[in-house]
């Protein structure tokens, strides 16, 4: 009984890390797949727009990649804590504090990615006519909203990880 309660917090953190990884990977896939082709007619060639053409969407993609890499680096720490039946991730207070500080930095970074995606998408959609936009343009913006939303959920999962880590540190 004591060993299962001892690994309950690290197990919850592992589940949240895996959820964070899945959300960031989904955000990465959605923003990378977001494409738009505008046909202006009149003999002009169609213009293809992807995340590469919009700085904020490139930022969303970059943060998703960085967040995935960071989460993949953190998963072994949690797995070792579970395997050793340690309540505190990292083994010592100093390592746990360092990991919490790193989590805070990356949670804020992921939140800025979500904010950049939401902000630009809202402004661009409003500037180009909002509800009067053609269906393909609306789909382009909605996919960007989806990527930013997934990233925001990942930031929330990281915030929960931080709370659980702090709780295990002070407990």
Swiss-Prot record:
Transmembrane helix is among the record's keywords: yes
Extracellular side: 33-59, 116-145
Transmembrane portions of the chain: 12-32, 60-80, 95-115, 146-166
Cytoplasmic topological domain residue ranges: 1-11, 81-94, 167-171
Membrane topology: Multi-pass membrane protein
Alphabetical list of Pfam families matching this protein: CASP_dom
Subcellular location: Cell membrane
Keywords (A to Z) from UniProt: Cell membrane, Membrane, Transmembrane, Transmembrane helix
GO CC terms in record: plasma membrane
UniProt main location, coarse: membrane
Record keyword Transmembrane helix present: yes
Entry's family note: Belongs to the Casparian strip membrane proteins (CASP) family.
Assembly mode: Homodimer and heterodimers.
Name of the molecule in the record: CASP-like protein 4D1
Organism of provenance: Oryza sativa subsp. japonica
């Amino acid at each position: 009984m004591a060993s299962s309660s001892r690994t309950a917090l690290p197990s919850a953190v592992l589940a949240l890390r895996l959820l964070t990884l899945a959300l960031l990977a989904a955000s990465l896939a959605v923003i990378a797949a977001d494409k738009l082709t505008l046909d202006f007619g009149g003999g002009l060639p169609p213009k293809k727009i992807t995340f590469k053409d919009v700085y904020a969407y490139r930022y969303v993609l970059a943060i998703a990649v960085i967040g995935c890499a960071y989460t993949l680096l953190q998963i072994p720490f949690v797995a070792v804590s579970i395997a050793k039946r340690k309540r505190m991730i990292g083994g010592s207070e100093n390592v746990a504090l360092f990991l919490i500080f790193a989590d805070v930095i990356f949670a804020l970074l992921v939140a800025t990615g979500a904010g950049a995606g939401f902000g630009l998408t809202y402004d661009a959609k409003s500037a180009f006519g909002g509800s009067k936009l053609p269906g393909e343009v609306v789909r382009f913006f909605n996919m960007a909203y989806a990527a930013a939303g997934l990233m925001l959920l990942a930031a929330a999962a990281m915030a929960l990880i931080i709370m659980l880590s702090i709780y295990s540190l002070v407990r």
